[in-house]
A protein has these predicted regions:
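Surface-exposed, well-ordered secondary-structure segments
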Residues: 1-150
Length: 150
């Protein structure tokens, strides 16, 4: 019996334009987003992991979601925030599969600003249909990655 290897996908969002609402742009890869907008951060405290374009939650929302056409077995991203960011995974029926979070990251800079380094958040669970990134303060999301079984 031959085991099927998952297809690994990484999105760096460099093909998006600033202030573009992100929904179905990656549907051909089996994923769609909700509540996300692309930006090029001007605040050096929220730098991108790679490139210059990141996602942030739209409006006053402090969460954004990704939905998989086929269940994923691994999903995550690099997030940048001055407070904790939580990643939660759900199955097709909306059942909780798992959760992980960053650590608070608040080094002080001489001018009183805060700077955050991108932190990797990931969950490895079978049957992930939706992931949600949430915080109580603004955050950026970059280099989103996931694995799909063939």
């Amino acid at each position: 019996m031959e085991l099927a290897s998952p297809r690994l996908i990484r999105l760096d969002f460099e093909d998006l334009t600033a202030f573009e609402r992100v929904n179905d742009q990656y549907r051909h890869m089996g994923i769609r987003f909700s509540g996300a907008i692309a930006i090029e951060p001007s605040n050096p405290g929220f730098r991108a992991k790679s490139g210059s374009t990141v996602l942030i939650p739209m409006g006053n929302l402090m969460s954004l979601s990704a939905y998989f056409d086929k269940p994923s077995c691994w999903a995550g991203a690099f997030v940048c925030s001055t407070r904790i960011v939580v990643l939660t995974a759900y199955d097709r029926e909306g059942n909780f599969l798992g959760q992980t979070s960053t650590v608070a990251n608040q080094p002080s800079l001489p001018d009183g600003q805060s700077e955050s380094s991108p932190q990797q958040l990931e969950l490895n669970r079978h049957g992930i249909a939706k992931v949600e990134f949430h915080s109580y303060v603004p955050f950026t999301l970059d280099d989103f990655f996931f694995a799909l079984m063939p």
